[in-house]
Amino acid sequence: LKEKIRLYIEENKEELFKTIQDVVRIKSVVGNEQEMQLYMKKKYEELNLILHEIEPKYEKVSAHEAFIDSGIPFEDRKNIIGIHKGVSNGKSLTIHGHVDVVSPEPYSNWTMDPWSGDIIGNKLYGRGSADMKAGLISNWFALKTLIDLGYPIAGDVQLHSVIEEEAGGGGGALACLEEGFVTDGYISTEPHNLNMTISHGGIMYFRVYVKGRTAHAGLAHEGINAISKMMKILSALDELSEWRAKNVKFDLFEKGSGQSVHLNLGVLKAGDWVSTVPGEAILEGRIGFIPGETREEIKQLVQDTIMKSVLGDEWMDKNPPVIEWFGWSTEPWYQDPENPFVKLFIENAEDVMGHKVIMVGRAGGNDARFTQYYGKQGLCFGPIGENMHGPDECVHLDSVVEVTNVLANYIIKWSES
C-alpha cells in the first residue's frame, strides 16, 4: 500500500500543486475567510464527505478558559468540516488547517505579487503558501488519495478547515471542538519543516500607559515628556528580555525555534505633533514563557520589572504607569512524547520519508494546543516554508509531497492501531 500511495501522489502531484495555487490566490486575510471556505467546501464535496458548517457561537466559546477574543465578529465566518466515515470502529483522526493569513503589507517589500501563487523551481510563492495553505491542501489530498485508491479506512477521518488561527483560534479550532468534533488524535499541518512539534510556549500580550504633561516645544521645560519617561520602562524590559533569553531554556524550543523565550516590544505610540511635548506614551508587548512557568508568575514578573524601573522618579511616583493585559493569553502546551499517538506518528513518518524525524517545540502558538483541554492527543507536522508572515513567503513543493505521503500512510496506521 505504501508504494501505491507514493505512486498515486507522484503521478497526480500537479493537481496538488495547482490546488495550492488556487487557494493562495484567494485573499483570505483574517476576518475575510469566507471565499476561501466556500472553495474548501467544494473540495470536500468532491470527496463526498459529510459536511458541517460551524459558525462560532460567541457566548459558548468565550466561556472557555482557552478562548482568545480576536475582536472580529463571527457572523458569516464559518468553519468547514468534512467527515469520511470509517468502515469499522477504528481510531478516529482530525487533520486540521487554517485558511486565514496575515496581511502581506507592505507590498513594496515583496519582489512579486503576494497573491500570485507563482512556482519558481521547487518553491511556490505567496502569502499563506506555507502558513498554512499548503498543509491544508495536503490534508485534503492525503484523504483523496486513499479514497481514489479504494482503500477502506477503519476509523472516521475529519478534515477541519478553520478560521482565525492567526488571531488566537477562538472562533476556529476551539469552536469546532466545542461543538463536539473531537477525535482520538489531532494533526495540524503547520509549516514546521518536516519536524514533529509537540509543544509550544505560553503567550501573553500586555500594554503600558505612561502619562506626561503636554506643553509647547518652546516651553518644553514646563512639560513632562511621556516618551522620555517610557524609555526607562523600555530599557528595563529589554534587559529582562536579554536575561530570559540567556537563562530560560526548554530543550524542545531550543531545537525548534533556536531560542526558548522572547519578549517582543511591538508597538509604541506617543505624541501627535512635533512641536508639542507628548502627554502620553503607549507601549504594547508580547512575552513568551515555557512549560513550568505560569501566567500568574509571568504577569507578576513583567509588572515588577516595570514598576521597579520607575522607582525614584518623582513624576512617576505620582503618576505610575498603568499596565493592562489583552489579546493572547495562553498557557504552554506540552504533548507527552511517549504517547502511542506520537510514537506511531514518528515511526510512520520515518518509514515513509526514509530519514529521522526531529521532535521539537515552538516559541509561537498554534491550534494543536486546544487538544489538551479535551483529553486528546495532538501534534504538528508540515512542509518546509520560508518567510512566514514576511515578504516572499514560499513553500517547498517536494516537502508538500512528503507531508501528503506521511499523512495518507498515517491515516491507515492510526485507524487500524
Residue ranges and their predicted role:
Residues V23, K27, Y44, E190, ...:
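Residue-level signal for inorganic ion chemistry
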Residues N122-I137, G150-P152, H221-I227, C394-V401:
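Short, conserved micro-motifs enriched in small and acidic residues
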Residues P104-I119, I198-Y209, E347-N348, L379:
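Acidic-glycine-rich active-site phosphate/pyrophosphate-binding loop
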Residues L1-L124, I153:
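Acidic/His- and Gly-rich active-site-bordering loop/insert found
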Residues L124, M132-Y205, K255, S415:
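Acidic/histidine-rich catalytic neighborhood of metal-dependent amide-processing enzymes
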Residues I83, H96-H98, V162, Y205-K211, ...:
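Residue-level recognition of well-ordered beta-strand positions that form the cores
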Residues L1-K4, E11, E46, F74, ...:
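Metal-dependent amide/peptide-bond hydrolase catalytic core
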